[in-house]
């Protein structure tokens, strides 16, 4: 009986202590990326929707029902 009271008290104290301590916040939860007004291009063998999604020298091609950036030519 005495040990169960100790367990309950320990649980309640740890619960109160965890609520009282402030949680540490990350300095920057989201990274801000600036592409100077232009979205980043997709590299070779990455998914795309149109040719303009792909980097220079690549085009958007269909392979096995997937659209991928592939070399032109």
From Swiss-Prot:
Chain segments annotated as coiled-coil in the UniProt record: none
Top-level division of the source organism's lineage: Eukaryota
Family designation: Belongs to the UPF0499 family.
UniProt name for this protein: UPF0499 protein CHGG_06021
Disulfide bonds: 41-55, 48-60, 54-69
Swiss-Prot/TrEMBL domain comment: The presence of a 'disulfide through disulfide knot' structurally defines this protein as a knottin.
GO cellular component: extracellular region
Swiss-Prot/TrEMBL keywords: Disulfide bond, Knottin, Secreted, Signal
Signal peptide annotation: 1-20
Location(s), subcellular: Secreted
Lineage: Eukaryota, Fungi, Dikarya, Ascomycota, Pezizomycotina
Primary site of residence: secreted
